[in-house]
Design a protein with these regions (language model features):
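Bacterial N-terminal signal peptides
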Residues: 5-16
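Formylglycine-dependent sulfatase
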Residues: 14, 18-396, 400-401, 410-431, ...
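Short arginine-rich
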Residues: 438-442
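Residues forming the ATP-binding cleft of Hanks-type serine/threonine protein kinase domains
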Residues: 407
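N-terminal secretory signal peptides that target proteins for export/translocation
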Residues: 1-3
Length: 470
């Protein structure tokens, strides 16, 4: 090629790169949504046509996990991990000690916006986002009567007022208004945080999708009662239903829960439609995830204060430019890997304290692996290690260990820990768990100083659960 032609080609390439629009992000975050509540990912009962649309447009992770919690309200650390990119042992739950990823997007020239649930304290909102509307600053409420505030330009919140609509619907309204206001001069990062399908499972009167409890199958790992004391047998969530768990009551709860998921799905559809109709459809990444799963009858439990798959595994769907279409990935990752991945895709420099591993290679080729193992924790009561096939859960306070072969037993119904042929595996996994915990700054012992009996007797009377914080 002659020199003049080479110069012309190089100039054209430079102009093309300069003209390429920056990548936008629309992040939708649910609250307590099990990974198995999406029709396109295998649930034959639930109706989620819009989440199904998103699944077909991108990559759905089948082994994405939250890492655990330091108290019953696991939403708090889960959101802190997501937004900071830091592990459970290393987070500041109030998000004040470390730069958040939304702040990093803002520093990179992005317009940043949040709407919906914020469970990490008011001071961290202006540290993370430039604009925020319809913020529910708390853990849980009746979503038809939720107190919400807007963030003023000063960073202060307006006095709270009762949302005139269902909180998830109004937060979606404000997100759509933000998207409509974008003029293309700056890329944007939008964060829509639902407070559902967290209980109470309330949707607007007249919402047309309904489920008959009799039509809802029980979870494959349903039990009337958990077989031993896991350390949190009477936490608020577990008081939502009497013991032993009646099958009919579990089906009714699941019917209400599925209906709430379907209501959220409608809001997801509104966001997808808005992005599709916008001038920035081709350069916008859409992410759907949840802060945790929840038991809802699995293993005799109702809540999320446990380390079983139904509570730790979360939906994670990513779609957008350069991302594979209609693919599943069994790469293992944490929720706190998601923001580093988005940063990599968008060219945003990571906060210096972010610890997550970016998984952008998986989004291009879903057959690629991510993390070789994952570890989990709930208080000092439960610790776990998952190497992709084998999962060990340790309960120090009762000196009990469980071992599951997730490949053969994905619902964790067959505890293999007592079988002699697995003794060496358990020994090695306990050693690995202990060393990895120590390396991450988790100094909880794997054997408690005081061992209590594993046998547990249910209360004859169920206390009325409080509403605070969960």
């Amino acid at each position: 090629m002659s020199l003049p032609r080479l110069l012309v080609a190089l100039l054209a390439a430079v102009v093309s790169l300069a003209a390429a629009p920056a990548t936008n992000v629309v992040f939708i975050f649910a609250d307590d949504q099990r990974a198995d509540t999406i029709a396109a990912l295998g649930n034959p009962v639930i109706k989620t046509p819009n989440l199904d649309r998103l699944v077909k447009r991108g990559v759905a992770f089948t082994r994405a996990y939250m890492q655990g919690g330091n108290g019953g309200a696991t939403c708090v650390p889960s959101r802190a991990m997501l937004l900071s990119g830091r592990s459970l042992a290393q987070i500041d739950e109030k998000l004040l000690k470390h730069q958040t990823w939304p702040s990093a997007f803002g520093a990179a020239g992005y317009a940043t916006f949040a709407a919906g649930k914020w469970h990490n304290g008011p001071p961290s909102i202006p540290k993370s986002f430039q604009q925020a509307k319809v913020l529910f600053v708390g853990g849980m409420a009746n979503p038809l009567k939720a107190p919400t505030s807007d963030m003023l330009p000063t960073g202060k919140l307006t006095p709270s007022k009762i949302s005139p609509k269902h909180l998830c619907e109004e937060a979606t309204d404000e997100t759509l208004a933000f998207l409509k206001s974008q003029d293309g001069k700056k890329p944007f990062f939008s964060y829509l945080a639902f407070d559902g399908p967290h209980d109470p499972h309330i949707v607007p009167e007249g919402f047309p999708i309904d489920y008959a409890p009799a039509s809802i199958p029980l979870p494959p790992n349903f039990l009337p009662q958990h077989p031993f004391d896991n350390g949190e047998m009477v936490v608020r969530d577990e008081q939502l239903m009497k013991w032993p768990r009646p099958e009919a009551d579990v089906k009714t709860m699941l019917a209400e829960y599925y209906r709430y998921v379907s209501f959220l799905d409608v809001q997801v559809g509104r966001v997808l439609d808005a992005v599709d109709a916008s001038p920035f459809a081709a350069n916008t990444i859409i992410v759907y995830a949840a802060d945790s799963g929840v038991a809802r009858g699995s293993h005799g439990l109702i809540g999320k204060q446990n380390l079983y798959e139904h509570s730790m595994r979360v939906p994670l769907i990513v779609a957008g430019p350069g991302i594979a279409v209609d693919k599943r990935s069994d790469a293992m990752c944490y929720l706190f890997d998601v923001m580093p991945t988005l940063g990599k895709l968008c060219g945003v420099t990571a906060p210096k304290d972010s610890q997550g591993s970016e998984c952008s290679a998986v989004l291009k080729d879903p057959s690629k692996p991510a993390r070789p193992f994952l570890m989990f924790g709930y208080k000092s009561l439960q610790k776990a290690l998952n190497d992709g096939r084998w999962k060990l859960i340790r309960y120090p306070h009762v000196d009990r260990t469980q071992l599951f072969d997730l490949q053969a037993d994905p619902y964790e119904t067959k505890d293999l820990a007592a079988q002699p042929e697995h003794a060496e595996r358990i020994k090695a996994m306990l050693a690995k768990l202990g060393s990895e915990m120590k390396a991450d700054g988790d100094n909880d012992p794997l054997t408690a100083e005081k061992i209590v009996p594993a046998e547990w007797k249910a209360p004859t009377k169920v206390p009325k659960p409080g509403q605070k914080g969960f």
